Amino acid sequence: MGKLIEYISILLIVVLVLSACGKSSNKDEGVKDATKTEASKHKGGTLNVALTAPPSGVYSSLLNSTHADAVVEGYFNESLLAIDKKIRPKAYIASWKDIEPAKKIEFKIKKGIKWHDGNELKIDDWIYSIEVLANKDYEGAYYPSVENIQGAKDYHEGKADHISGLKKIDDYTMQVTFDKKQENYLTGFITGPLLSKKYLSDVPIKDLAKSDKIRKYPIGIGPYKVKKIVPGEAVQLVKFDDYWQGKPALDKINLKVIDQAQIIKAMEKGDIDVANDATGAMAKDAKSSNAGLKVLSAPSLDYGLIGFVSHDYDKKANKTGKVRPKYEDKELRKAMLYAIDREKWIKAFFNGYASEINSFVPSMHWIAADPKELNDYKYDPEKAKKILDKLGYKDRDGDGFREDPKGNKFEINFKHYSGSNPTFEPRTAAIKDFWEKVGLKTNVKLVEFGKYNEDLANASKDMEVYFRSWAGGTDPDPSDLYHTDRPQNEMRTVLPKSDQYLDDALDFDKVGIDEKKRKDIYVKWQKYMIDELPGLPMFQGKSITIVNDKVRNLDIEIGTDQSLYNLTKEA
């Protein structure tokens, strides 16, 4: 389910490229903005869009791209399925029908859809994209997303030259057979954006992510095609006249990386028309501006947490190793959460665009438990102190900070990724202050985003406690982030009971097509996890997009039938 805001779901990437993936709580948070701009039939012109973070340059979501990369990709490529307002898949470029429920499915893609190099989208492109993920030379994190296809394991291990469960019927149709029945067979399947077989098949799979065809000259099937890329700074796109839904309204789109603290000023000067992935602070500034700026916000699937790297990890083998005992006691983790005034922290840094959460599932998803069923870790520093005292974390030398139960110095090493968001440093400092008020000495460090991701992916020894934000996909299953055997399980949690719940919720023999049975299991999982507390849930947010008064045909609400090709700007 959850996907890092910097790591976008490949299961069904409907990147609403002009909005962040985020989720508000079910209660009224006091912020009521529009979700869309006015309609217009205007044609022509250039739209200037601010990117709040520099792309890494891996412009394919199948190859471990960052969120910034995926935002760029969303302008020139498209997924094969869309989602409705209930976050369920619906036909778009592809349609499907069950041959054998949860075991065999047939997909059909529309005819006449062209890649930017002029070649037609074919079912071979879909099969190629799946084979890339299953190939033994693939170095990304998404093999688990295809390993349940019949024959994928043999292909991955080099025992077969094709995946037996992928059967091409014709140029536009294929049948997929899975090893076993699984409830999320559709939402958990790879539905794009795809890779072009004709364009990329001459590049060795191990070199795809660093190839010029991905980094400098990427192609897609979307309404705009890449004209020029200035690495880490800008992407220029021009309309693709052969786009399958018709000629796009705009002539050009320029994506520019701009420091978040300067975006509103750039919009006031007319240099920027749209700021996606905006923050609450930016929304506040936009509302106080006299430049005719408009704030759009909508519920989405974003939540943030503080994680603990609990075990050693061998990335190459995808094997979890020895436990790291420092934060092994869940009562210590509970004390750390009780010590944080999340309500005050959210109010200070999110300006009404977030709320507290006591779950590892965004409340917008249908599997979300009723908050009343979950432990509520309301701010209670005295309770935190009592827990720490009971555990034996006491100040033995009179310096104001607690030693561990064995009398050794105890310091929390807390990291946050760096970036242009001006709240990163103060919100990290605020967490330090909360913990130190209950006697837990804390060291904080902001780390360059690329290194931060690498350190987490490798479970580096100096990565102990860290901050993350995740953006959910259409599949609500949380296995990607919390199952022991998943590469994206950055906390390296080893909780057999959690794994069993997650496995059972996808076991067709146990739940069939009964969503209530599946939800009941996920609710039990949420109750278990909020008690085990492998991480500290902090907030769930809203998506925010800021536009000037000329932008038209933009709707950021999840499930809207809007394509970028309609997006326009009045002269």
Residue ranges and their predicted role:
Residues 209-215, 240-286, 441-443:
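Ligand-site clamp/hinge motif
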Residues 184, 189-248, 252, 262, ...:
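Gly/Pro-rich hinge or "lid" segments in bacterial periplasmic/extracellular proteins
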Residues 38, 103, 334, 346, ...:
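Extracytoplasmic/peripheral linker and loop segments enriched in polar/acidic and small residues
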Residues 143-202:
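Surface-exposed binding/hinge segments that line
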